[in-house]
Amino acid sequence: MLDIQLLRKDLDGVAKRLADRGYTLDVAAFSALEAERRAIQTRTEELQARRNSLSKQIGAMKGKGEDTSDVMAEVGGIGDEMKASEAKLGEIQTRLSDLMLGMPNIAHESVPVGKDEADNVEVRRWGTPREFDFAVKDHVDVGTPLGLDFETGAKLAGARFTMLRGSIARLHRALAQFMIDTHTLQHGYSETYTPYIVNPEILYGTGQLPKFADDMFRVEKGGGENTITQYLISTSEISLTNTVRDSIVEGSALPIKLTAHSPCFRSEAGSYGRDTRGMIRQHQFDKVEMVQVVAPDASYAALDEMVGHAEAILQKLGLPYRVITLCTGDMGFSAAKTFDLEVWLPAQNTYREISSCSNTEAFQARRMQARFRNAQGKPELVHTLNGSGLAVGRTLVAVLENYQNADGSVTVPEALRPYMGGMERIDAPAQVS
């Protein structure tokens, strides 16, 4: 959530910066609510002052034995008006809060202004795409004989679900374990196991609600007035970041660095017809997430560090990739700045997103009331960052395509062999005649 004081000081400036993100701030609606709020607060202060004055007057009158009934009646009327004003003020505050909850974060000044992904800026590349001396297959054609089972996944749960079998399932697990081990043993993150189902207020904290309710899978139990609504997490960023919700941590405890491997659930409501083949876009997928909670003056150094941690996974796996800076129109709702890592997929002859690393600055912290005690001993909002380290399913896709062989087998990357019992190659199971 943005700082409402910023809007009160520079409403037109905020509106312009939000317009760079493709968001139209209803300046008239905000101004009208603010004017009404100020008027009610001013009137309430006047009523409070009048009531205090009358209370003193009543005390003096009683001391003289004078009749106070008229003054008492006026005090009662003031009390009634103040109650009505408080109710009206509460209504206005709710409407202001609803308006604020729908506003995206303001982009950092270093973010390129643009409309969509066409305006993103490439930062660097690593690795050279492999040259094949045979016809390259996509991950579906490579993986299906080896244990990718789209048919059974669809039979069990519908479109955009996949079953993994045998060595492919083991490779998928190996990738997640390798990522977690790298982040915990080499990058300083603390491994965390989180709930996969969370309460609605947790999603408000990280920014998925109220705007993206249609992208979430909702779980309801009970019935009628006793219905309890919860949501499946779309990323473990949600659970990890909210661990500092409604708390004040000591400055000496920062940075807090957490990582988790979890399934993620997304309805993909706005992606009809996109990436319908294979594992690129699924309703259920695994991801290893990185989260950092840091002091404000350290957050952009932490962002660069987090990008480096995601890059390290790709480099250890020998997968070519590029890093891009997302433009204002392509960033996620809560982000102030985002770097995407895109891995090379030879069958598509292009780079595809495999990690997104974002600094949300104080945007999530303000929604969560997550603070730290600064050097002066005063509570101050933390900055929160999140990044994929990496999306496990898409990494599996990249391994299958980049390490495929002419005979249909897949070479196991060296970094994964300790997690695969020393296996160097995945071959299709022998067919029984």
Curated annotation (Swiss-Prot):
UniProt keyword annotations, A-Z: Aminoacyl-tRNA synthetase, ATP-binding, Cytoplasm, Ligase, Nucleotide-binding, Protein biosynthesis
What GO molecular function terms would the record report?
Answer: ATP binding; serine-tRNA ligase activity
Q: Where does L-serine bind?
A: T235, S236, E237, E289, S388
What sort of enzyme, by top EC class, is this? Answer: ligase
What span is annotated as the signal peptide, if there is one? none
Enumerate the Gene Ontology biological process terms: selenocysteine biosynthetic process; seryl-tRNA aminoacylation
Q: Does the keyword Ligase apply?
A: yes
Principal localisation: cytoplasm
**Which reactions is this enzyme annotated as catalysing?**
tRNA(Ser) + L-serine + ATP = L-seryl-tRNA(Ser) + AMP + diphosphate + H(+); tRNA(Sec) + L-serine + ATP = L-seryl-tRNA(Sec) + AMP + diphosphate + H(+)
**InterPro entries assigned to the protein according to its UniProt record, in alphabetical order:** aa-tRNA-synt_IIb, aa-tRNA-synth_II, aa-tRNA-synth_II/BPL/LPL, Ser-tRNA-ligase_type_1, Ser-tRNA-synth_1_N, SerRS_1_N_sf, SerRS_core, tRNA-bd_arm
The reply on keyword Ligase is yes
The UniProt entry, under CDD domains, shows:
SerRS_core
Q: What is its EC number?
A: 6.1.1.11
Q: Where does ATP bind?
A: R266, S267, E268, E353, I354, S355, S356
Spell out the family assignment given in the record's similarity comment. Belongs to the class-II aminoacyl-tRNA synthetase family. Type-1 seryl-tRNA synthetase subfamily.
Query: According to its UniProt entry, what is the function of this protein?
Result: Catalyzes the attachment of serine to tRNA(Ser). Is also able to aminoacylate tRNA(Sec) with serine, to form the misacylated tRNA L-seryl-tRNA(Sec), which will be further converted into selenocysteinyl-tRNA(Sec).
**What does the record's free text say on domains?**
Consists of two distinct domains, a catalytic core and a N-terminal extension that is involved in tRNA binding.
Q: How does it assemble?
A: Homodimer. The tRNA molecule binds across the dimer.
What protein am I looking at?
Serine--tRNA ligase
**Source species:** Burkholderia ambifaria (strain MC40-6)
